[in-house]
UniProtKB/Swiss-Prot annotation:
Keyword Iron: no
Protein name per its UniProtKB record: Chaperone protein DnaJ
A GO molecular-function annotation: zinc ion binding
Organism: Rhodopseudomonas palustris (strain HaA2)
Comment, domains: The J domain is necessary and sufficient to stimulate DnaK ATPase activity. Zinc center 1 plays an important role in the autonomous, DnaK-independent chaperone activity of DnaJ. Zinc center 2 is essential for interaction with DnaK and for DnaJ activity.
SMART domains: DnaJ
Organism placement in taxonomy: Bacteria, Pseudomonadati, Pseudomonadota, Alphaproteobacteria, Hyphomicrobiales
Gene that this polypeptide is encoded by: dnaJ
């Protein structure tokens, strides 16, 4: 009986004053949630889905909605002139349009040729920091699927052709009626290709593709960083049955370097210097990324951790004329395995040292003295 039916507005979870846009939005949301394909094996979902569609079919139509608002479900019972909510071809079209949008099926209509784009491929390549600095052209070999030459990618034996699928008429999809609504599904006979290959090509067993080793040249520009991706258009898997090929993506990683650490376009290195050089000052040579050398001047009294900037000796910036800098951090080495004479000289040096020659140490021990002195005076 009509009295047992749930209110259409409640079914769509909208107010009675809802406009067309609100109705459509509510329908999309609920249809997505309760669609049978998203709830396989759940009979209650199918019932709920039918209720949602019935409610939307009535409320989206101005005349039917007016009749429903006045008479309720009785408006569509026999004797009221409605003959039921009237789910016909118009509903199937509306339903199909909405679900093509929801499930991404719009582009699959009439595909009929069975052509599919080839898959994209990934290739991981490790390069050196020097390669990233100078740039290079590398040769790589990769196994890829290419179009079968025996059948020209059709998948059919030479001298034969694929036949149009009789089940779907070449569309690749079939419509299935379920009660008052229609669902569009992949054709079970041709698996969506739209064609049937009765006599497959022996070289590719009907796939239209074979695997071969391919040698490719990869141009690595200056300034690439760890994780840089290079795209080679059309060098991926061959398309299925004449479809376009996919792309090949080269993912670069930089090997660790024995001397330099990279930070964007800047390079960093750590160089040990002698205690004498640090105390008296001097200079030392450091290597550069272009396999040259440059001199660094060290002022007297240099401490461990001090950094020196060498402008323009870093990495080039990708697709730019800019170049980073190199930063050299010094580490003052404490001498080991001293001779007796060296020990005596250092001991003599220590006796002659004062706060002026070791300001940081003098300042620290002064603070220590003050600290213990203040504790001694505390009652």
């Amino acid at each position: 009986m009509s009295t047992t039916k749930r209110c259409y507005y409640e079914t769509l979870e909208v107010e009675r004053s809802a406009d067309e846009s609100t109705l459509k939005s509510a329908f999309r949301k609920l249809a997505m949630k309760w669609h049978p394909d998203r709830n396989p094996g759940d009979a209650s979902s199918e019932i709920k889905f039918k209720e949602i569609n019935e409610a939307y079919e009535v409320l989206k139509d101005g005349d039917k909605r007016a009749a429903y608002d006045r008479y309720g479900h009785a408006a569509f019972e026999q004797g009221m002139g409605g003959g039921g909510p009237g789910f016909g071809a118009g509903f199937a079209s509306s339903f199909s349009d909405i679900f093509e949008d929801l499930f991404g099926m719009a582009g699959q209509r009439g595909r009929g040729t069975g052509r599919e784009r080839g898959a994209d491929l990934r290739y991981n390549m490790e390069i050196t920091l020097e390669d990233a600095y100078k740039g290079k052209t590398a040769q790589i070999e990769i196994p890829v699927s290419v179009t079968c030459e025996s059948c020209s990618g059709t998948g059919a034996k030479a001298g034969t052709k694929p036949k149009t699928c009789s089940t779907c008429g070449g569309a690749g999809r079939v419509r299935q009626a379920q009660g008052f609504f229609t669902l569009e599904r992949t054709c079970p006979s041709c698996q969506g290709r739209g064609q049937i290959i009765e006599d497959p090509c022996p070289s590719c067993t009907g796939s239209g593709r074979v695997t071969k080793e391919r040698t490719l040249s990869v141009n690595i520009p200056q300034g690439v960083e760890d994780g840089t991706r290079i795209r080679l258009a059309g060098e991926g898997e061959a398309g299925v049955r004449g479809g376009p090929p996919g792309d090949l993506y080269i993912f670069l990683s930089l090997a660790s370097h024995a001397i330099f650490q990279r930070d964007g376009a800047d390079l960093h290195c750590r160089v040990p210097i002698s205690m004498v050089t640090a105390a008296l000052g001097g200079e030392f040579e450091v290597p550069t990324i272009e396999r040259g050398k440059t001199k660094v001047k060290v002022p007297s009294g240099t401490q461990t951790g001090r950094r020196f900037r060498i402008a323009g000796k870093g990495m080039p910036v990708l697709r730019s004329r800019q170049v980073g800098d190199m930063y050299v951090q010094v580490a003052v080495e404490t001498p080991q395995n001293l001779t007796k004479k060296q020990q005596e000289l250092l001991a003599e040096f220590e006796k002659l040292s004062s706060g002026a020659t070791q300001p940081e140490a003098a300042g620290f021990f002064s603070k220590v003295k003050d600290f213990f002195g203040s504790r001694a005076n505390t009652p």
